[in-house]
Amino acid sequence: AARYQGTIKADIFFIARGENLKAIRENGLQMQLGIRTIHTAPALATDNPAEIGPADYLFCCTKSYDLEENIQQLKPVIGPKTVIIPLLNGLDIEERIHNILPGQEVWKGCVYIGSRLTEPGVIEKFSLKERIFFGNKDANKDKQTELLKLLMYARLNAFNPADIDLRIWKKFFMISTAATTTSYFNETIGEVVNNHIDLFITLGYELKSVAEAKGIRLPDGQVFSAIDAQKIMPNNSTTSMHSDFQKGNRTEVETLTGYVV
């Protein structure tokens, strides 16, 4: 939104609610990058999708447990030519959307970013390299290239790989093992790596076998790559699911743990 602000190349809309919506309307969405803050002003921020009308591309970035309710609420922005790109955690997201909207064009997607909402309308980003992957092997390639160009113009590290299913499994592999162990032991990532690495490895190999049963060939070193990814995280950091358990909030345990079981 910051990159397209004041241009005619694209209109970026935010659909939000409650205190987040109020803050975005007053100050834009703010992203804190260390000592620097980026202010983004969308063309419109609203809790009423009907004010927007049918979109070309709809990025769905909600929690997985809100997916069905949110898709119903978003129907006013979903037209016959709208492409839905879900960036949710989970392996069955496309299927769940098609259960609600049969025949709608849905691409697959995932994003790598370390961030958290510190207050309404303010996001702290602590990752060093963000990446967004999207695609659909059966979708029109020109349309996918169009979106790729839009994202790259916004200076995002965007990729449209042919192996999008593998990319999503790799992302899920990393977050499922970490979310499950940090939540089960009620410990930080650093504590899990130091104290329970054997269980982390066991869960990793179990998930790898599930992937193979689904026809996904993960790299031989996937388990230890996931461990290495956790080791470079700050020792006191944890997962979103663990944080939600600590706060007594609703969690994505069914998506990140239950689905595998």
Predicted regions: what is each one?
Residues A1-T37:
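NAD(P)+-binding Rossmann beta1-loop-alpha1 motif at the extreme N-terminus of oxidoreductases
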Residues D11-F13, I85, W107, F133, ...:
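A structural signal for isolated positions on well-ordered beta-strands in alpha/beta enzyme cores
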Residues A16, I35, D47-P49, L88, ...:
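Residues at the C-termini of beta-strands that transition into short coil/loop
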Residues E19, Y65-D66, L91-D92, D142, ...:
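Short alpha-helical
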Residues A23, P76-V77, N99-E105, P120-D220:
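Internal alpha-helical scaffold of NAD(P)-dependent oxidoreductase catalytic cores
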Residues T37-V122:
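Rossmann-like NAD(P)(H) cofactor-binding subdomain of soluble oxidoreductases
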Residues E51, E124-S127, P234:
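Short, flexible turn/loop "capping" segments at secondary-structure junctions
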Residues D142, M152, I201-V261:
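NAD(P)-dependent Rossmann-like dehydrogenase/reductase catalytic/cofactor-binding core
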